């Protein structure tokens, strides 16, 4: 695969053998926004399993997702996480001391609050007797928080768990250089003035150069944007297709926002500023305007631009997960069941963003479902090219047989069921918080349209991925 992808991108004017296989059927992502047809209610089996607890989502919320450098720029990550937790408490009226455990996902750690889950929980007024821990798994960090909660409840360790995620891209940690850090530590250990002066003679001006957070994959030294560009080229996804898909995402998000479908948002009164009540990254444009943008990563021939990529985002989400018995005993009407889930990983060099392709057939088999059983799809949109490349891979028998060891393709999701309230391209992508947003969008869509099953999937740095089946709770 490495050879195929590398040769494909070295000469974009020449279509590789792999690209040829994926250039036959273009994907239609019309810029015209159309209402998705109502889900046809079908009599389906439940995925409840004998002798296993039913685990439910009672409610999930998020503060508005904002472009980094805007209204949240003067805050810390635990401020955002605390706001999401406070919103969940307000929305559910759950007694704080009933919560057994709190788990939050995050990617870029704030050194002052290394366990942001605990600090946010204390700030939101939860009992100091309630344990909390933080997990990190790149863009599926809050997915990991949710499934960890499922495990705690399924094993009988807990009945009530809050899971969530947070990311603040407005203020990422910037360190001193390694040489400067070593000198500062040595100076701190020095016992005499002579020792300190001796150390200072080794100082060089380049020690003052800051060490910025890594944007490239550690194992491959390639940015995700570069990977997205190569993936789009290998799967013959054109710039026009990518721009059309991005426009679709923004247009659908704007429509959902105007029609009140983004009901998981809770307003946040930013200290010293106005109350924020809606996402601010939704920007329907035109294909003509988008076409003017230059490639963002591989120049001059790349196809990934600022318009067809997700943007740096600040935000937080939180979800109340309970055993069904406990939820009903407390008088709650759950929104959905959390059913089967799976994590996958593959080559981070050439399959970095193909997590949904690998995870989807596995989770469907685990649940005993097919693509036709799914009423709502919610996939994380890192890049337009990533989504469309996954579609082509999922819809290819050749790819399934040669790279996945499967006899047949799983099939691509139908667009009329796919991310119809927008996605990460338009709503934003706070790395640690997106997973909870995906699950709540899936649950709310099932509830609104009368569907029974939703499939949530996401890719993540390191060549990892996740998929989960969400089942509607009976009305």
UniProtKB/Swiss-Prot annotation:
Claim: S-adenosyl-L-methionine is one of the keywords in the record: no
Pathway stated in the Swiss-Prot or TrEMBL entry: Lipid metabolism; fatty acid beta-oxidation
A GO BP entry: fatty acid beta-oxidation
Modified residues (N6-acetyllysine): 73, 189, 294, 299, 333, 349, 362
GO molecular function: acetyl-CoA C-acetyltransferase activity; acetyl-CoA C-acyltransferase activity; acetyl-CoA C-myristoyltransferase activity; lncRNA binding; protein-containing complex binding
Transit peptide: 1-34
Residue pairs linked by disulfide bridges in the UniProt entry: none
PTM sites of type N6-succinyllysine: 53, 73, 189, 191, 273, 292, 294, 333
Annotated intramembrane regions: 174-221
EC numbers for this chain: 2.3.1.155, 2.3.1.16
Function: Mitochondrial trifunctional enzyme catalyzes the last three of the four reactions of the mitochondrial beta-oxidation pathway. The mitochondrial beta-oxidation pathway is the major energy-producing process in tissues and is performed through four consecutive reactions breaking down fatty acids into acetyl-CoA. Among the enzymes involved in this pathway, the trifunctional enzyme exhibits specificity for long-chain fatty acids.
Protein's name according to its UniProt entry: Trifunctional enzyme subunit beta, mitochondrial
Source organism per UniProt: Rattus norvegicus (Rat)
Gene name of the encoded protein: Hadhb
């Amino acid at each position: 695969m490495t050879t195929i992808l590398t040769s494909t991108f070295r000469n974009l004017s020449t279509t590789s053998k792999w690209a040829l296989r994926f250039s036959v059927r273009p994907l239609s992502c019309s810029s015209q926004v159309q209402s998705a047809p109502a889900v046809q209610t079908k009599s389906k089996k439940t995925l409840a399993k004998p002798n296993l607890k039913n685990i439910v989502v009672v409610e999930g919320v998020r503060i508005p997702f904002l472009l980094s450098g805007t209204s949240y720029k003067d805050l810390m990550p635990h401020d955002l996480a605390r706001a999401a937790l406070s919103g969940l408490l307000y929305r559910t009226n759950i007694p704080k001391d009933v919560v057994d455990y709190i788990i939050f996902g995050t990617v870029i750690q704030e050194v002052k609050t290394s366990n942001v889950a605990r600090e946010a929980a204390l700030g939101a007024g939860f009992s100091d007797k309630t344990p909390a821990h933080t997990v990190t798994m790149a863009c599926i960090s809050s997915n990991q928080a949710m499934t960890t909660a499922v495990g705690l409840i399924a094993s009988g360790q807990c009945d009530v768990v809050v899971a969530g995620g947070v990311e603040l891209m407005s203020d990422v940690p910037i360190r001193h250089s390694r040489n400067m850090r070593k000198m500062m530590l040595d100076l701190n250990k020095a016992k005499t003035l002579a020792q300190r002066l001796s150390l200072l003679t080794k100082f060089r001006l380049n020690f003052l150069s800051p060490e910025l957070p890594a944007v490239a994959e550690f194992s491959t030294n390639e940015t995700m944007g570069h990977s997205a560009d190569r993936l789009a080229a290998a799967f013959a996804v054109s710039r026009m297709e990518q721009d059309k898909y991005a426009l679709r995402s923004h247009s659908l998000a704007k429509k959902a926002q105007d029609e009140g479908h983004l009901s998981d948002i809770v307003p946040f009164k930013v200290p010293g500023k106005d109350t924020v009540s809606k996402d601010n990254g939704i920007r329907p444009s035109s294909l003509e305007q988008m076409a003017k943008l230059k490639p963002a990563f591989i120049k001059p021939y790349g196809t990934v631009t600022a318009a067809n990529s997700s943007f740096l985002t600040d935000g937080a989400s939180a979800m109340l997960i309970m055993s069904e018995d406990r939820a009903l005993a407390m008088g709650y009407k759950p929104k959905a069941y959390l059913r089967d889930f799976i994590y996958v990983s593959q080559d981070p060099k050439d399959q970095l963003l193909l997590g949904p392709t690998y995870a989807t057939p596995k989770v469907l088999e685990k649940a005993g479902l097919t693509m036709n059983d799914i009423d709502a799809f919610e996939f994380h949109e890192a890049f337009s090219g990533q989504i469309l490349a996954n579609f082509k891979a999922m819809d290819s028998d050749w790819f399934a047989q040669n790279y996945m060891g499967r006899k047949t393709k799983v099939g691509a999701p139908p667009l009329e069921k796919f991310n119809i309230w927008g996605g990460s391209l338009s709503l934003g992508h706070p790395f640690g918080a997106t997973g909870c947003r995906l699950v709540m969008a899936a649950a709310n869509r099932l509830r609104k349209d009368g569907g029974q099953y939703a499939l949530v999937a996401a890719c993540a740095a390191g060549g990892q991925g996740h998929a989960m089946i969400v089942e509607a709770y009976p009305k």
